[in-house]
């Protein structure tokens, strides 16, 4: 004889989520990248908008003018600490992808490859 008890499953009541209210009609101008800035109101000061990339460029030029050239080769060495085995580095200093296991030939007992 099998015991037949009451099911404990109870479906959750469905909740109705109201859609967000529309403030006004949606215009394509609102989504354009080249929208003219709105005119400032009486209480707001007038500001000039600049391209963020151009503003960043101007800041970079002023900061690097007094420092001289950046040592690029030295900064790359700091990013990759030396482990004592540089066999993975390619001729240009970038790491090479590991070889395809299907293409790798197993060395014979007499031959030994350097392993890192």
Swiss-Prot record:
Mark the transmembrane ranges: none
Q: Give the matching InterPro entries.
A: GAGE (IPR031320), GAGE_fam (IPR008625)
- Quote the biased-composition stretches of kind Acidic residues, using this chain's numbering: 31-44, 86-95
Query: What are the boundaries of the region Disordered?
Result: 1-116
Composition bias (Basic and acidic residues) maps to 102-116
Q: Quote the record's miscellaneous comment.
A: This gene belongs to a multigene family expressed in a large variety of tumors whereas in normal tissues, expression is restricted to germ cells. These genes organized in clustered repeats, have a high degree of predicted sequence identity, but differ by scattered single nucleotide substitution. Their sequences contain either the antigenic peptide YYWPRPRRY or YRPRPRRY which is recognized by cytotoxic T-cells.
In the record, the note on similarity to other proteins reads: Belongs to the GAGE family.
Q: Which PANTHER family match?
A: G ANTIGEN 1-RELATED, P ANTIGEN FAMILY MEMBER 5-RELATED
Mind telling me what this protein is named?
G antigen 2A
Q: Name the source organism.
A: Homo sapiens (Human)
């Amino acid at each position: 004889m099998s015991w037949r008890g009451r099911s404990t499953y109870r479906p959750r009541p469905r909740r109705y989520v109201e859609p967000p209210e529309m403030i006004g009609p949606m215009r394509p101008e609102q989504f354009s990248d080249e929208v003219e800035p709105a005119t400032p109101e009486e209480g707001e000061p007038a500001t000039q908008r600049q391209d963020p990339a151009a503003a960043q460029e101007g800041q970079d030029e002023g900061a690097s003018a007094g420092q001289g050239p950046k040592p690029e080769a030295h900064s790359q060495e700091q990013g990759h600490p030396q482990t004592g085995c540089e066999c993975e580095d390619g001729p240009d200093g970038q790491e090479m992808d590991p070889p395809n296991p299907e293409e790798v030939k197993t060395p014979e007992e007499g031959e030994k490859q350097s392993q890192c």
